[in-house]
C-alpha cells in the first residue's frame, strides 16, 4: 500500500464510524437534539474554524458530515491526502461531541477530553511570549514505560506543553508521574479520536489570538503552521486511522515523528522516521524549528556577568592553560546537522583532578555548530564571545582569543567541583541562547591531551585562522559597496562610533569588516548597521555624504563629517571615533 492508500483507508474507516454514530444518536435522541462541547463559544470548534458554520443539533451534525465528505477526494496527490487527513480530524470531532450529549462527562481523571475556552486563553499568553515554546502531542504506547516517561519529562523540563493520547497515559500513571494542566502534562483520552482536543486548542488559538475569520481555511492553516509550534510523536505500530490523523496534523503544519518502519513513507520535514525513541525530542524540536532557551546551566559554581571582572591570582589558582607557553586554541566549526549531536560534551585528555596544582596545561576546545541559517562568516563572531562566556563563571578567568588564550581555574572553583567539562556546558548553553537564530545544534569537544592540542592548533585551527585573514586581505575599501557602523562601546561612551571598512578595523582592533557584516546579519537591529557609500564627495579621501549622515546619526550629532582615508593620510583632523 502507498501512503495515499493508507490515508484514504483510515479516512474511510473513521468516516464510516462517524456516520454510524450520528445515525445511532439521531435514532435515539431525534435530529433536533442539541450537541455541543462544554464551556466554549465556538460550537464545534474545529468544524467552525475550517468551514465558518456552527453546528448545534444532530441534524446539523449530519449535514456537516456531508460537507466533510467533499474533502475526501481520492486523487493521489499530497494535497488530497492532507485534506483527507483534515476530514478524518473533523470526523473525530463529531465522534467526540456525541460523548457529551445531555451534558455527559465522558472523561474521568486523569483524562481531560475537551479543553474549555478559558484554558485556551490561559495558555495563549505563555505561547505568545515563548514561555511555552512548543506543544507536543504524544500518541500511543512507548516501547517501554521508562522510555515513555523519559520522553514526557524531557519535554516538560523544556517548558513544552505535553498532551497525551492512548497508551502513554497508562504508562505515565504506572510510573507515578504527576499530570495536569498545572504541570503542563495533559492526558486527553485513550481513544485515538481524543487527539482532536489538542487540534481544537490550536484552531481556537487561531480564532482567539490570530483574528482568523472562521471559514478562511487557507489563513487558518497558515496561522497554525507559522504560529502554533506543535508536533506529533506517534509510537508504532501505526494503523491506517492513525496515519490518516497524522495527515491532518501535517496539513496544519505539525510534523509527525514516529519509530514505525513497516509500510511507512517518509515526507521530508513532515513525516519523519526516527527509530531511536530517545532522539524523538531532538528530532521534533529540529523539525518544528523550536529553540529552547537554557535558563539553568549545570555547573557547581555561579554563572553571572558579575564575575566578568574577577581576577585570579597565581596563589589562588588551581591550574592554568596558557596559549603563550603551550599549544592552545578555541575554534567554532560549521558542520552539517548530521555531524553534530546536540548537547554532547566530550573531554579528550585529563580532567582538572589529574593536573598538578599550579601547573600550566594545554587546552583546545572546538565548538561544532549546525543550523539552516549558519554561515562560516559567523564563526569568528561566536568565537569572540567565548571570552565573555567563560569569564562569567565564578572562579574562572579567561583572556585572549584564537590560539593565544589563557584560562585560570581557581582553587575555590575546583573545590566546589568545577571540571573541564563544565566549560563545555557553559559554551553550549551560551551559544545556543545567544545565537539561536542561526545555531540549531551545538556540540563541544575539549582537548586537554597535549598531543591532541598540538594537532588541533596546528592542523585544524591555524589553517582556518589563516584562511580568514587571507580572505580579509583581499578586500579593499573600494571593492565593497557598504561599510558598517559599530557602536558597541556606546554603553560607556555615548557618542562613540566606528566606521568599519575592509582596510580599517574598529579602534578596539577586534571588529573587522567581515565581523561587522556577520554581526549585522545575526542581529539586524544591533550595534553594527549598514552604511551605504553611494554619494561621493571625494572618492580619493573616501568621503561620502551617506557616510557623513550615518556618522552624524550614530554619534548623536557629535560628529558631522568623516573621511576614512584621512585616518591614514591625516589630510583632515577627523578620525573614525568621537
Task: Please state what every model-predicted region is.
Residues 504-510:
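Cysteine-rich micro-motifs
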Residues 424-476:
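A broadly conserved sequence feature marking short terminus-proximal activation segments
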Residues 489-495, 511-514:
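Cys/His-rich metal-chelating microdomains
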Residues 568-574:
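Conserved small/polar residues in nucleotide/adenosyl-binding loops
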Residues 475-483:
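Short, flexible, mixed-charge glycine/proline-rich loop motifs
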Residues 2-386:
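Acidic, serine/proline-rich low-complexity intrinsically disordered regions
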Residues 514-523:
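Short metal-binding segments enriched for Cys and/or His
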Residues 482-485, 494, 504:
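Short metal-coordination and nucleic-acid-contact micro-motifs, chiefly zinc-binding Cys/His arrays
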Amino acid at each position: 500500500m502507498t501512503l495515499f492508500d493508507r490515508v484514504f483507508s483510515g479516512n474511510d474507516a473513521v468516516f464510516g464510524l462517524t456516520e454510524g454514530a450520528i445515525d445511532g444518536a439521531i435514532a435515539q435522541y431525534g435530529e433536533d437534539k442539541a450537541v455541543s462541547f462544554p464551556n466554549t463559544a465556538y460550537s464545534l470548534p474545529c468544524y467552525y474554524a475550517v468551514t465558518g458554520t456552527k453546528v448545534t443539533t444532530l441534524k446539523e451534525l449530519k449535514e456537516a458530515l456531508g460537507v466533510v465528505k467533499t474533502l475526501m477526494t481520492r486523487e493521489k496527490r499530497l494535497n488530497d491526502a492532507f485534506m483527507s487527513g483534515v476530514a478524518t480530524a473533523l470526523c473525530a470531532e463529531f465522534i467526540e461531541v456525541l460523548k457529551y450529549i445531555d451534558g455527559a462527562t465522558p472523561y474521568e481523571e486523569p483524562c481531560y477530553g475537551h479543553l474549555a475556552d478559558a484554558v485556551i486563553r490561559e495558555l495563549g499568553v505563555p505561547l505568545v511570549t515563548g514561555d511555552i515554546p512548543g506543544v507536543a502531542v504524544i500518541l500511543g504506547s512507548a516501547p517501554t514505560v521508562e522510555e515513555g516517561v523519559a520522553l514526557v519529562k524531557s519535554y516538560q523540563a523544556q517548558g513544552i506543553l505535553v498532551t497525551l493520547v492512548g497508551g502513554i497515559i497508562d504508562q505515565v500513571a504506572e510510573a507515578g508521574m504527576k499530570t495536569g494542566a498545572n504541570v503542563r502534562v495533559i492526558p486527553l483520552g485513550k481513544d485515538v479520536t481524543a487527539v482532536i482536543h489538542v487540534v481544537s486548542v490550536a484552531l481556537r488559538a487561531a480564532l482567539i489570538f490570530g483574528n482568523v475569520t472562521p471559514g478562511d481555511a487557507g489563513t487558518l492553516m497558515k496561522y497554525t503552521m507559522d504560529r502554533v509550534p506543535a508536533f506529533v510523536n506517534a509510537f508504532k505500530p501505526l494503523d491506517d486511522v492513525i496515519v490518516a490523523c497524522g495527515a491532518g496534523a501535517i496539513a496544519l503544519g505539525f510534523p509527525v515523528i514516529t519509530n514505525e518502519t513497516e509500510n511507512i513513507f517518509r515526507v521530508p520535514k513532515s513525516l519523519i522516521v526516527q527509530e531511536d525513541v530517545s532522539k524523538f525530542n531532538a528530532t521534533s524540536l529540529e523539525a518544528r524549528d523550536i529553540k529552547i532557551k537554557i535558563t539553568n546551566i549545570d555547573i557547581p559554581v555561579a554563572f553571572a556577568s558579575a564575575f566578568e571582572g574577577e581576577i585570579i591570582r597565581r596563589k589562588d589558582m588551581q591550574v592554568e592553560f596558557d596559549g603563550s607557553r603551550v599549544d592552545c586554541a578555541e575554534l567554532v566549526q560549521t558542520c552539517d546537522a548530521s555531524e553534530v549531536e546536540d548537547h554532547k560534551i566530550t573531554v579528550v585528555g585529563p580532567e582538572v583532578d589529574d593536573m598538578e596544582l599550579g601547573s600550566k596545561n594545554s587546552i583546545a576546545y572546538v565548538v561544532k555548530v549546525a543550523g539552516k541559517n549558519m554561515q562560516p562568516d559567523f564563526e569568528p563572531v561566536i568565537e569572540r564571545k567565548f571570552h565573555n562566556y567563560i569569564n562569567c563563571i565564578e572562579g574562572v578567568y579567561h583572556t585572549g582569543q584564537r590560539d593565544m588564550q589563557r584560562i585560570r581555574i581557581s582553587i575555590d572553583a575546583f573545590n566546589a567541583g568545577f571540571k573541564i567539562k563544565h566549560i563545555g556546558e557553559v559554551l553550549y548553553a551560551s551559544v545556543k541562547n545567544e545565537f539561536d537564530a542561526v545555531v540549531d545544534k551545538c556540540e563541544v569537544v575539549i582537548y586537554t591531551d597535549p598531543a591532541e592540542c598540538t594537532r588541533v592548533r596546528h592542523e585544524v585551527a591555524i589553517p582556518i585562522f589563516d584562511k580568514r585573514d587571507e580572505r580579509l586581505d583581499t578586500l579593499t575599501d573600494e571593492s565593497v559597496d557598504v561599510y558598517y557602523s559599530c557602536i558597541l562601546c556606546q554603553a560607556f561612551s555615548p557618542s562613540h562610533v566606528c566606521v568599519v571598512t575592509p582596510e580599517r578595523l574598529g579602534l578596539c582592533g577586534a571588529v573587522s569588516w567581515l565581523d561587522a557584516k556577520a554581526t549585522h546579519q545575526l542581529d539586524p537591529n544591533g550595534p553594527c548597521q549598514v552604511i551605504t557609500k553611494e554619494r561621493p564627495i571625494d572618492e580619493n579621501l573616501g568621503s561620502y555624504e551617506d557616510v557623513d549622515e550615518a556618522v552624524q546619526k550614530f554619534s548623536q550629532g557629535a560628529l558631522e563629517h568623516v573621511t576614512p582615508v584621512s585616518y591614514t593620510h591625516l589630510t583632515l583632523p577627523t578620525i573614525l571615533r568621537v
